[in-house]
A protein has these predicted regions:
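Accessory beta-strand-rich segments of carbohydrate-active enzymes
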Residues: 1-62, 88-89, 106-110, 248, ...
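Extracellular recognition modules
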Residues: 23-25, 165-169
Length: 415
């Protein structure tokens, strides 16, 4: 389940020599639909690409790429960390296989070249009694099986989206490359200090928009031309950030944000809306909540444009969101976590599971009424803060998290 998250299936055992037919059965609604109650038009069918992939018996299953300052607090030199993962079939053990990691700049010049031993990375002979430095008996698992310090790299920002290219080459015992994957790399560091969002040590103000995947002619199917048009409009309006409201977008969107420069708040496909916080507080739904966030983060973890995870939208708050926050922070300590529903009410502080204070539906002008408030009533919904209330929150001294308006100038009906 999860119509906006990636899915992958191993169909090897069902294939036969010659021509094969693959059939898809798509359900428009399921019990998972209770977590997809976003305010948008609902369509049936397949609206994203499907790929059939053939791989060797040892393959690069996944990899994590991170960039961190080589010295904490100094943004001159960066450390490149690569954590590869492999899948093996047919009894292979990886003996004699190597993984070559080559980083090139935008002009194709080689910056660094590293080689790792696949057998050591797989560590198939690991026994419980044997120490494993990457998955220790106590403490978190380590990152960076392959790492190098890059001297004075070009830094990635939304204004200067400089990208390097990382080539990962899996080579067999004869030195032949049997698989190669390429990953754009942007050297950047995201931090929160003293109530400010920092990119490479510099304070940044996000001037962002919410964006649905919606085309007047192709509905949910987003062409590259339409995505480029959206980014151009944002750039012309001095927009530097976008929230993937309210689900992970098609993969090509993140690639364009990497190369053209937009800060992305990547949002999980979770919105129970009319049920308020019922499901967020129900343990039966714990796995469904976590599954959607995990699949989002696993897919988008290597994009430099993704600077923040968002746990969802308008689903109340409860232990299921606390679980998502714990997983995201442990899986990826390099990005802050957002969720507009994690709000304190009646003077209570916002939960510590989020790294930013989020409010929405703020008035564009003071005289404008908030949504849902009858004219003439002097009443303020807790989640619809006035601008002066946001300023008050930002200036308080007992909570130094940045304040963000996750939605404003709300206009139902456009998507």
């Amino acid at each position: 389940q999860g119509s906006m998250e990636p899915s992958e299936f191993n169909i090897t055992r069902w294939l036969k020599p010659g021509e094969n037919q693959i059939a898809l059965e798509v359900y428009r609604y399921s019990d998972g639909s209770y977590l997809e109650d976003q305010d948008f038009w609902r369509f049936g069918g397949v609206h994203r690409s499907i790929h059939l992939v053939h791989t060797p018996d040892i393959r690069i299953r996944d990899y994590v790429v991170r960039t961190l300052p080589a010295v904490q607090g100094n943004y001159q030199d960066f450390r490149l960390l690569i954590d590869p993962q492999f899948s093996v079939y047919q009894g292979m053990d990886g003996k004699g296989y190597t993984l070559q990691a080559v980083l090139k700049d935008a002009d194709g010049r080689e910056v660094v070249n590293m080689v790792g031993n696949v057998e050591d990375i797989l560590d198939l002979e690991h026994k419980a009694a044997r120490m494993n430095e990457w998955y220790p008996q106590r403490g978190p698992r380590k990152m960076g099986r392959m790492s190098a310090v890059i001297k004075s790299p070009q830094r990635w920002t939304a204004e200067t989206p400089y990208l390097y290219k990382l080539e990962l080459r899996l080579q067999n015992v004869n030195g032949q490359t049997i698989e190669q994957v390429e990953q754009p790399v942007g050297f950047r560091c995201i931090e929160i200090k003293d109530g400010q969002m920092l990119v490479n040590g510099n304070s940044v103000r996000f001037r962002g928009v919410n964006r649905h995947e919606h085309d007047p002619y192709t509905a949910r199917v987003m062409s590259e031309e339409r995505m480029l048009q959206d980014i151009l409009l944002m750039k012309q309006a001095n927009v530097n950030a976008v929230r993937t409201s309210h689900y992970p977008n098609v993969s090509r969107w993140y690639e364009l944000c990497d190369s053209l420069g937009l800060y992305v708040m990547d949002e999980a496909d979770i919105e129970e809306h009319g049920l308020r916080g019922t499901l967020a507080s129900t343990s039966d739904w714990h796995a469904a909540f976590l599954d959607r966030a995990v699949r989002m983060a696993e897919r988008d973890k290597n994009h430099p444009s993704v600077v923040m995870w968002s746990m969802g939208n308008e689903s109340g708050y409860g232990p299921n969101f606390a679980a998502i926050s714990a997983w995201l922070h442990d899986f990826d300590p390099t990005r802050p976590v957002h969720y507009e529903g994690a709000q304190g009410v009646n003077g209570e502080p916002d939960p510590k599971t989020v790294d930013v204070i989020s409010r929405f539906y703020t008035r564009v002008k003071q005289e404008y009424l908030n949504p849902g408030i009858p004219e003439g009533e002097d009443k303020e919904r807790a989640e619809n803060a006035r601008w002066e209330r946001l300023l008050e929150i930002a200036e308080r001294t007992n909570d130094n998290r940045p304040v963000m308006t996750s939605e404003y100038a709300h206009c139902m009906g456009n998507a």
